[in-house]
Design a protein with these regions (language model features):
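Low-complexity intrinsically disordered segments
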Residues: 2-3, 17, 141
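Extracytoplasmic metal-acquisition and chelation regions
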Residues: 12, 27-221
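Bacterial N-terminal signal peptides
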Residues: 12-25
């Protein structure tokens, strides 16, 4: 039951990100060039930029950020960006080399280091450890890929799954874009406030649904 409940709650956050991206109005004329690595972050930034412009997504389709290789066109887009937003060079290894060689004009936002982002430890030991050892052979490949989702200090890289972290992601992105384009600062502030209100509502909903099982251990995989 715990696993099913957690899957349902995580699906709420995923649904929020999808709905956030849909039907976003665009501003006529030239807009800030904002490039984002992965879909969950892109969805949040797209809503933040509603009425201003549309951020460009790098890892599209079913591609994995762990194995993604930059094409000349995507490398060029990052080099020509005003703001480049990523989670971390561990979650997105393809960003390591290009970030070190970007022009100084490109503002790089590494979200795992953003103010207000809470990092959660990689799950291990106890119930989770027993679960892993019981499925070692069947899930060896899956666990190997999962390991790439964690930073070197053992922290989980899926920072956007926590609504509080999602607010911090939006705040860091808004700050970077507004610094480059102060003429959009007020619109960004308005959009950020609207996103925060929705995320607060989602956080309350999740807390309410989790209340009956808050003291029970459960596994997410």
């Amino acid at each position: 039951m715990g696993d099913l409940m957690t899957r349902a709650l995580l699906s709420k956050m995923s649904a929020f990100l999808v709905l956030t991206f849909m039907s976003l109005p665009l501003r006529a004329g030239e807009a800030p060039k904002v490039v984002v690595t992965i879909k969950p972050i892109h969805s949040l930034v797209a809503r933040l930029m509603a009425g201003i412009g549309q951020p460009q997504l790098i890892v599209d389709g079913s591609a994995s950020p762990h194995t993604f290789t930059l094409k000349p066109s995507t490398a060029r887009a990052i080099n020509e960006a005003d703001v480049f937003i990523r989670v971390s060079d561990t979650l997105e290894p393809f960003t390591r080399k290009i970030v070190s060689s970007l022009p100084s004009a490109v503002t790089v936002v590494t979200l795992i280091d953003a103010q207000g982002v809470k990092l959660f430890d990689q799950r291990h030991g106890g119930t989770f450890e027993k679960h892993v050892h019981g499925h070692e052979e069947a899930n060896a490949e899956g666990h190997a890929e999962e390991a790439e989702d964690h930073d070197e200090d053992g922290k989980d890289g899926h920072i956007w799954l926590d609504p509080v972290n999602a607010k911090a992601i939006v705040a860091a992105s808004a700050k970077a874009i507004a610094k480059r384009y102060p003429e959009y600062a007020e619109k960004l502030r308005q959009n950020e406030a609207a996103i925060d209100a929705d995320l607060d509502a989602l956080d309350r909903e999740i807390a309410t649904e989790l209340k009956p099982v808050r003291d029970k251990p459960f596994i997410v995989f």
